[in-house]
Amino acid sequence: PALATDAAPLLAAAMLCADSESSIEDVIFERRFGCAEGFCRLGAQAETAGRVLTIAPGGHLCGTVVEAPDLRGGAALVLAGLAARGTTVITHPAHIDRGYAGFTEILAGLGAQIRRESAPGNGSVKKTSAKKQICLAIGTKR
C-alpha cells in the first residue's frame, strides 16, 4: 500500500476533527479499527463496515474511560483523548508501551496533560495478573 497501514488508526484519530465525513480502509488487516468503539465512547460518530472506518462530522469528544484495544488503537485513543474535553482515562496502556517507548513522556514534553495513575476501581477495568493496574489519564492536572 502507498500508506503504511499501521498509521491508519492514528490518521483515524485526526479524522475525528474533520469538518466533513471521512473514511479510511485498511486493505491488510480486517480488524485494524478496534479503536472505533473507544471513539464512540468519547462521543464520535464512528462506525466500521468490514475493513472501512467512517467518521461523520459533528461528534463532540468528551473524556471518559476507554480501553486500549491494541498497540495502534491505543495510541489513536490517546490522540483522541487529547482532543476531547475533560479527562480521558485509557486502561491497558501496556499495549501502547510495547510499541511506543516513552510515549507518555514525549507527549508530556510537548505540553500534553497526560499522566500515569492507578486504574479506576469502578468495575469497568478488567482484572489482570499485574499487582497494580495502571492507566493513562489525559486532559487534567492533579
Residue ranges and their predicted role:
Residues 1-142:
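Short, structured segments at the rim of ligand-binding sites
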